[in-house]
C-alpha cells in the first residue's frame, strides 16, 4: 500500500493546502496529514497576525478533519516539533520524531518504497530523500494555481477571505452585534446593512421563539425558556458566521437576554453567562 504524507502548520488552512491534500489523495492509497506545531513558534506567529481570534493546534487539526471528513483515505494527526532546532539544522531530529509517530500508525513502514511525501515547499525533495529515503511529489511550488500563502493571509485575512475553507471562516469571522431597546428598528437595520455589504445576518432569536413556542406573546415566558433562547440564538449566529462575507451582523447579544432574565425572573442564569 502506498502511503502519502503531507506536512504543514496550516496557520491557517487555505484552499492551496486543500488542493495539495486533495491531489495527494489521488496519488496514493492513504494520505496522512501531519499538523505540526511548536508552542513558542506558533504563539509568536499568531500574535503577529491580524486574526481577531487565536488558532490553537487543535483548531487546526479540526479544520483539516472537518474539511476531509467524508474521505476515508485521508487521516490527520498533531505532531509536536517544539523541541526541534530550526530548519535546516533540525531536519535530523525532526525526521526521527516523525518516523516514530508514523510507525505507530503504520508499523514496519518501508520508507523507500511505500512512502511518498507530497509538498509545495522547495528543498523538501532533497531533505526527504536524505533523512527518510523517500521520494517527494512537488505540487504547485510556485503558487500558480492558488496565488496565496499562509503568511499573506495572516497579514490581511479579509483580503484573502475567498481562499479560506468554510471551517476556517467560521472560526475567524468578525462578529458585529447591534444592541438596543425592543422594537427600535434593529432587525431592519441589520437586514439593510447585510444587503449593502453582501454578507449574512442573524436576527434576534427571542422574538422567533416567542412566536413559535409561546403563541406569539410573552405572557407564558418563564425561567427555563431563556436557556432555549440563547441556544437558538447561538445556532443562528454560527450559521451566519459560516456563510458570512468577511464579517457577520448580529441582532442582539446574550447580555440582553441575561438582562431580561434578571429583570423578569429576578434570578441569575449561569448558562447564559457562559455565552
Residue map of PLM features:
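Nucleotidyltransferase catalytic core that binds NTPs
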Residues: 1-174
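Short, structured active-site "lid" loops
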Residues: 50-70, 219-246
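ATP-dependent NMP and nucleoside kinases share a basic, alpha-helical "lid"
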Residues: 105-107, 127-131, 253-275
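Hydrophobic anchor at the beta1->P-loop junction of P-loop NTPases
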Residues: 178
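The conserved Walker
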Residues: 182
Amino acid at each position: 500500500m502506498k502511503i502519502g504524507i503531507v506536512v504543514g502548520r496550516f496557520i491557517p488552512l487555505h484552499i492551496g493546502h486543500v488542493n495539495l491534500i486533495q491531489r495527494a489523495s489521488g496519488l496514493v492509497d492513504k494520505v496522512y496529514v501531519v499538523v505540526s506545531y511548536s508552542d513558542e513558534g506558533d504563539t509568536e506567529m499568531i500574535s503577529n497576525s491580524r486574526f481577531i481570534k487565536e488558532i490553537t493546534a487543535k483548531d487546526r487539526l479540526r479544520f483539516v478533519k472537518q474539511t476531509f471528513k467524508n474521505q476515508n483515505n485521508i487521516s490527520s494527526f498533531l505532531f509536536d516539533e517544539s523541541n526541534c532546532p530550526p530548519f535546516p539544522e533540525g531536519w535530523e531530529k525532526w525526521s526521527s520524531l516523525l518516523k516514530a509517530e508514523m510507525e505507530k500508525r503504520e508499523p514496519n513502514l518501508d520508507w523507500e518504497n511505500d512512502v511518498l511525501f507530497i509538498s509545495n515547499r522547495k528543498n523538501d525533495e532533497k531533505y526527504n530523500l536524505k533523512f527518510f529515503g523517500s521520494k517527494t511529489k512537488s505540487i504547485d511550488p510556485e503558487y500558480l494555481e492558488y496565488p496565496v500563502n499562509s503568511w499573506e493571509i495572516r497579514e490581511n485575512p479579509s483580503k484573502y477571505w475567498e481562499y479560506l475553507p468554510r471551517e476556517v471562516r467560521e472560526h475567524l469571522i468578525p462578529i458585529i452585534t447591534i444592541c438596543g431597546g425592543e422594537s427600535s428598528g434593529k432587525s431592519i437595520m441589520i437586514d439593510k446593512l447585510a444587503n449593502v455589504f453582501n454578507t449574512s445576518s442573524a436576527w434576534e432569536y427571542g422574538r422567533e421563539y416567542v412566536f413559535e413556542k409561546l403563541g406569539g406573546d410573552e405572557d407564558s415566558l418563564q425561567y427555563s425558556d431563556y436557556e432555549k433562547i440563547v441556544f437558538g440564538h447561538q445556532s443562528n449566529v454560527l450559521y451566519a458566521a459560516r456563510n458570512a462575507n468577511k464579517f457577520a451582523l448580529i441582532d442582539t447579544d446574550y447580555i440582553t437576554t441575561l438582562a431580561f432574565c434578571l429583570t423578569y425572573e429576578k434570578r441569575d442564569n449561569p448558562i447564559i453567562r457562559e455565552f
